[in-house]
Amino acid sequence: MNGILPLYKPTGMTSADAVYHARKILGIKKIGHSGTLDPNVDGVLPLAIGAGTKAVPQLMASGKVYTGEITLGFATTTEDLDGEVVDKTPLTQPFTADQLDAALTAWTGNITQIPPMFSAVKVNGRRLYEYARAGETVKRPERQATVSQFTRTDEPVFSATDGTQRFRFEVHVSKGTYIRTLAVDVGKTLGVAAVMSQLTRVKSGGFTLKQAVSIEQLKAHAAAGTLADVIQPIDIAFADLPQVDLTVEQFEAISHGRFLSLDQQTPRVRLHFAGVLKAIYRREDDQYRPDLMFLANEKNV
């Protein structure tokens, strides 16, 4: 079995746990995910199955869309609600909608982020969260990210009792963007402490939340023998590349790793034979050469 499974990961489950459950249900060991979701974040987690694992870099390179909530007035060690409160800046009056929108706009475009201490980024061979759990702080490398859209999606709610204000948002980002840090940065722009108080990934790898399948639904499909209904073909990860349908002779040629002369000009193409993705070829010196091979890929039934 080969393909891409858009899985719904609930809150409280790690991405590794989601992979474990999928392996157990499908009886397949070769399964990987295309971008970690923190335990307290729910949403779309595309899983690559079998030969589909070769498509993970392509899936990870795609942009992601999140919806969530930012709360102004306090900060935590983890930049979300899981951490300990380390700063309080009680609001005596609410920010206007225009002020909030301007702060979001300020973090739209090409931005620079410093990864949070509670993250999986490695520094000197150790994960940042390992330093954080040991009570250590290290210098973290800056990372570039792109925020193509960052908008408020509801009316802000102010609590005079708590000195907080919260509002929901939708954000479209490039891979590797830390939404927790984005929430904190919005607070800095407004001059107050802030946390990400809720987050859902609604699009990843080209898959939307509506397409995502829960663990329970996956079990039901496995029992009914209808897994082909939810496991998408590998080529969906390369849908932006031109498709070339191979002749028998051309398929024989790529089966032996040979180059092809094609009536194409794009940097990469996806090669199909008998309706199934068999290879990704890249253009070099007026010929197309092997990039990724999927010769054993067949239709899931």
Swiss-Prot record:
**SUPFAM superfamilies reported for this sequence:** Pseudouridine synthase
Is Transport a UniProt keyword of this protein? no
Classify the source by domain of life. Answer: Bacteria
User: What Enzyme Commission number(s) apply to this enzyme?
Assistant: 5.4.99.25
The reaction(s) annotated as catalysed by this protein in its Swiss-Prot or TrEMBL entry are: uridine(55) in tRNA = pseudouridine(55) in tRNA
Gene3D superfamilies for this protein: Pseudouridine synthase (3.30.2350.10)
List the active site: D38
Q: What family name appears in the similarity comment?
A: Belongs to the pseudouridine synthase TruB family. Type 1 subfamily.
Q: What is this protein called?
A: tRNA pseudouridine synthase B
Q: What is the source species?
A: Lacticaseibacillus paracasei (strain ATCC 334 / BCRC 17002 / CCUG 31169 / CIP 107868 / KCTC 3260 / NRRL B-441)
